[in-house]
Amino acid sequence: MEIVSRAWESVDWDRIQTRVEAEVTALGQRQDDSEIRKTRLVEESNAYRGRTNKDSRKVAIPLIKAFQSEFDGLLARSTAAENALIDICKSIVSLPDPKSLLKGAEAWKNDAEKTQKAVEEREELKRQLIKVNNELEDLRGKDVKVRKLKDKLAKLESEQDIFIENAVNEVEKKAEQELNDRLTELIAEKEKMKEQNEILEKNMDSLESKNKDIQRKLEIAKQTVEQKDGLENEQLSIAMKDLADAKHKIVFLEERVSQLENEAEKVNESKKAGNIEDIAALGSVLVQKDDVIQQLTNDIKRHEASHVEELAKWKLAVSAVEKKNKTLIGELNELKNQLESRNDYEAIKNELRLLREIEFGDSAEANAESIERLGETVETLDRLLAEKNRRLQNENASLRVANDGFKGDEVMKAIVSGSHSRVVETVGKRVGAEEANSYRQKNTDSELIEKIQEAKRNKAVCELKFEDPTINVLTYLKNQKAKEAGKRDAPTPILAAPVTPKHVTKLGTHTITTTALPPRTQTAETTQSILQRLSNGSNKHLLNEDLKLSTVLNLKRFSGNPAKPLEAKTSEEQKAELETIEKMQKRIQVNVQALNGHPLNTTEIASHCKRLMIAYNIGQRLFAKHVMNQVVKSQGSLSELLSKPRHWNKLTDKGREAFRRIYGWISDDEAINLLCSLSPRRVWPADQNIEHPKAETLLDTSDPMEFKEEPVIRYDVTPKVEPVIEKIKSPVESPCSSQAGASSLRASRWRHDDISKEKILSILQTELKKIEEETTESKVVVPVKPTATGGNRRFSSNSTYESSSLTGKSRPSTVELILKQRISTGLQPLTQAQYDAYTVLDTDFLVKQIKEFLTMNSISQRQFGEYILGLSQGSVSDLLARPKTWAQLTQKGREPFIRMQLFMDDVEASEENDEKQPKITICDEDSDLAKTLATLLNAVHREPSEPKTSVKLEPLSEIDVIMQVPSASKPSSVVKSIDESSGEEILDTFEIVYQVKGILEENGISPRVFGDEYLHCTSSMCADLMIRTKSFENSKASEKLMYTRMKTFLSDPIAIPLLVEKEESKETVKAKIESVPAPREAPRPVKRKHSSDTDDYDLNTKKPIQRTVITDYQKDTLRFVFVNEQHPSNELCEQISLKLDMSLRTVQNWFHNHRTRSKAREKEGKVYSDALPNGTAVKSLTWKDDLQKMLDEAPAITSQWAPDYQNRAGSVKSSTSADSPTNNNYSSPIFSFDKASTTSTVKKPSSTGKLDNLVARMIRLAEGREAAAAKAS
């Protein structure tokens, strides 16, 4: 004690405190100097970044790293000085304190008193231990009882299983016996069942549905039994586990008791030793042990109560299982009775299968071969019969129409009767060789003439190869006869005219060809007889002779482009093809540059492009390869682009470039010719002129300031009927017609050359079907067919195609209304009632029904999945391609099928409501189609001078029709009713919002401007009214006022121009602000900048949609994952999106796209290097650890380019300079000292602070330094 007191008295406290305060002051001064220097370094780095580019900064990186190493050395020196001060303070603190010894003396007295109390508590613990031992003996006895109960339960379960098996076996034996008896009776009654086949076909559907219900019940019963068995096994396993846990706890208690006994003995020994400190520690231990014993006692009691409850539950479960078995036995009996009543199902099924095979062939049986060939499962018999009946009715109606058209037509009478050779000669005499030659194919005629002249020069006409498919047999023989007649007599008028052979005659979509000569085995007599038949024009039995002639000559039909063996292209052909492609690309590029950034009418361009590709038989793959020039790489992308063209203002840069290239092709006749020369299927109707659009009609000239009246839409079916009438008309009916009419009739003479009766009837039937479909289904006007000029194959259109919205009277279809409702309400979660309503569904039938529905209504899988199922396109495709059975699906897997069934129920209910309403049909019956067409044609011929307004619209998909809004709608259509009591109008809020949205979108007006300027409400309230629309009755007073203003807006013609001006002025101001050069512009690595050509457009056009751009580091990380795992899990995708600051959908789409491209490259035998880091595939077993490191480093790398200085616990941030206007234009500094830390910055202490506070602050400072160093390492 004396030594300690002397040591404390010799300490000079004033000197030590003065020294510590001086050191702290120096530390604060050094810290301030360091902050000033770092601030200056940050400013200099920002200035350096603004003055230099990336390349020059790369050169300066070594210098920056040298500065960093010097900075680290200075920090180390500063840390050493601070550690010295801390050591001094610690040495002061480590001096012994004499006060603690004095306080310890008082504590010893208290410990002695506690020791006496501990002895008394030890005696009490002994008594408690005796009680615990007694309770343990009781627990051992209860364990034996539990084992007996478990054995009894096992015995009861085995007996129950044996009873169930015996009952099932008996039922099966009885069912088999009854089925065998019934089969013998069915064999005897087979002949009677054939007579009742018609009745059974009508009842087949009901039998199949009942059979499916029985199968579903059997599956449900089987599932319930399996679930019960599984539940019982699970409960038994839980009970066994609980018993085992109780046993382990008992063993554990025994061990604990033995430990307590040992500790008690040690306590006794320590008492004898008389160590005061051990006695104090033992007291605390005993208190803890007492608590543990009390807790164990409570656990044992609780387990005993739980065991009693479990035994009661098991008894109830056993009784429930017995009851369930009784019910199952009853259900089995019912099923047995139902099977007895349906035992003739197999015989009926076999008979119907035989009927299907006889009537419908391969489509009757659903085997693997037929499914692979047909691509779908077998259709039901009623559907097949209905299709056959419909097909026969259409054929019958077409034949009646053709028969009516043939009456009074001399040419068609001659063709039907078979004497078409006389028709050919008669028309040839009347028309003349000059007019006929003008409608021939010049190339074909010249080729044939050259071949004939070559044969004459070789003097081997008789030895000509008759197998040559390019020579017309009849024309050749006529020429031979004319030559012989010319030698004997003067040339006749008919044979004097040079009748050159026609190579191929085309009619519509069919190719009418001549036949080839037989091999050179015919005798001279046979040839002479053939010539005599051809020259005899007055023979009455010309048809029979022609048939005999075709038999003798063994006539064969061949195509206009005969199939030739595939030969490798020569170098000259490849060079010519490359020159053609280069020439076409140059013309397209010139046409694109001539646009000068002008917006295009995408709908018209897509329509004309599809029409020209179909007319010239150009494949989409060839078009995408040579015309799109890598803008659209795949056939599917081109099909999507043409089938659903988006508005020009909604297209990305890539989409606009695609439509520019399409424009450059369809607006240039030479480019079209060049692509046709590249097409391997160069086949088009040579006798028809194909219309090319003018370049002016493809430009987007719409102006939101102009509001034109809606043109009257007329259903002009003349262009579709005209080709059929040209084929049916006779040249005798209109002898005084104009030159154009005569030309068309003379052209039809060559189209009908060598056409059989069956071919003409089939062509007429096909054309009439097309007219019927387009007349009954289309809601848009077909463009008027312009007149042909001369013999040109192509010409430019003289009529412009203007888009027109549907009239107010034409309402959307049932499917459109349902989809519109689903889009407005969104995807609602399923209720329990809906789950209960569809406990079992036939997934195969439902998927087939959905496929047919989507195909019939032109709904894409993406739209169906997004608005109906809430799934992606890939998930919908998997569901529809490979549906699982209902029993194999989980609760989550059944949800999409339930949504499909609910959707189909809504469609059926809406269709039933529509059937109750009166309908307006164009043709009541198929037989009235010809009369309707004739009436329309007569009206057209009577008023040839009446101007027509023809508007061509692209066929819209269901979603496009929903989103399309009429430009003018009547306000009265948005009023549902009028309240009689108050006289208030009850408005149709959904219709009002639907129309207002369409008008705003059509004119490019934002909801913010609409709400501020017209509704006089906030933008949030306007958006809420648009998105979450309520009914008028459930709306508030303020909301009703807004809906009333919207209704007024629909009938206010002045409001739209005013809002457009506001929108334009707003965009103009914004454009001026953006055009001002900012001193410092923040980089935007995530979003793509606006297109460069948008500055050339008007300000009222909408801005292009910005698309997500992936940075290089994000790409490298995604490629690294793709190499090691092409199908990452959702958790991994979420982690990647979180660390790389990307959306989850972007990450998933990236992997999906690269998987698809990788598979395509693998099919081609190539390696997909785009998804490989540095072009090489390096897999690693520890790729997950490497990925984690990359993700951890991602924020530091993506946010800055320079190395990150690790500073101390405080944060040094550079503030914005005075000349920077906003924080958005602030550029991050090169040197960043931001570091997340929870420690506080050291402040200067006051000179009057106490020594303890100073020491505590120094210790916190040291801890902060250590934490920063640990994070940096």
Swiss-Prot record:
Q: Which Pfam families match?
A: CUT, CUX1_N, Homeodomain
Q: Name one GO cellular component term.
A: nucleus
Compartmental location = Nucleus
Print the keywords alphabetically: Coiled coil, DNA-binding, Homeobox, Nucleus, Repeat, Transcription, Transcription regulation
The coiled-coil segments of this chain are 101-407, 440-468
The record's Gene3D superfamilies line, in alphabetical order, gives:
Homeodomain-like, lambda repressor-like DNA-binding domains
Residue ranges of the region described as Disordered: 1069-1100
Q: Which residues bind DNA?
A: 591-681, 832-919, 978-1065, 1103-1162
Kindly list the biological process annotations in GO that this record carries: cell differentiation; regulation of transcription by RNA polymerase II
Can you tell which superkingdom this protein's organism belongs to?
Eukaryota
Which Gene Ontology terms cover its molecular function? DNA-binding transcription factor activity, RNA polymerase II-specific; RNA polymerase II transcription regulatory region sequence-specific DNA binding
InterPro entries, A to Z: CUT_dom (IPR003350), HD (IPR001356), Homeobox_CS (IPR017970), Homeodomain-like_sf (IPR009057), Lambda_DNA-bd_dom_sf (IPR010982)
PANTHER family per UniProt: CCAAT DISPLACEMENT PROTEIN-RELATED, HOMEOBOX PROTEIN CUT
Q: Additional comments on file?
A: Asn-1149 may participate in regulating DNA-binding activity by promoting homo- and heterodimerization.
What is this protein for, i.e. what is its function?
Probable DNA-binding regulatory protein involved in cell-fate specification.
* Recorded family membership: Belongs to the CUT homeobox family.
Q: What is this protein called?
A: Homeobox protein cut-like ceh-44
Q: Give the source species.
A: Caenorhabditis elegans
